[in-house]
Amino acid sequence: SKGSRHHLMLDDVFLYIQSHLTEDLSLERLENEFYVSHEHISREFKRQTGQTIHRYIVKARLDHCCSLIEQAIPLTEVYKMSGFGSYNHFFRAFKKEYGMTPSEYFKTTKKEARSS
């Protein structure tokens, strides 16, 4: 059916984003990858997930950063592996999402590790 084909496509989009998080993930790139207009991808994504594709990418990158920070990887390295274009962008997005800086987050992970 037509509906399930779009769902399948979205699963592919999720997988593609997850496996290319560290790269530049523009809508144009997704458009070329999936042979669908970026308007269509954006609309379908929002309709099925309730969030924008940009928001999903940012959140996926931040989740990835958190797991790297939890492994005690230096923040300068985390940022390079994050897919955010600049340290500033990474820093601001992180703080906005979690209400703390990446280094503050690192300190909380160390505390939790000691207390468990």
Short names for language-model regions:
Residues K2-V13, T49, I53, V58-R61, ...:
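N-terminal positioning helix adjacent to the helix-turn-helix/winged-helix DNA-binding module
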Residues Y16-Q18, D24-A60, Y79-T108:
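Basic/polar phosphate-binding segments, predominantly the helix-turn-helix DNA-binding elements
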Residues D24, A72-I73:
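Residue at a beta-strand N-cap/secondary-structure junction
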Residues K107-S116:
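Generic C-terminal helix-cap and adjacent flexible tail
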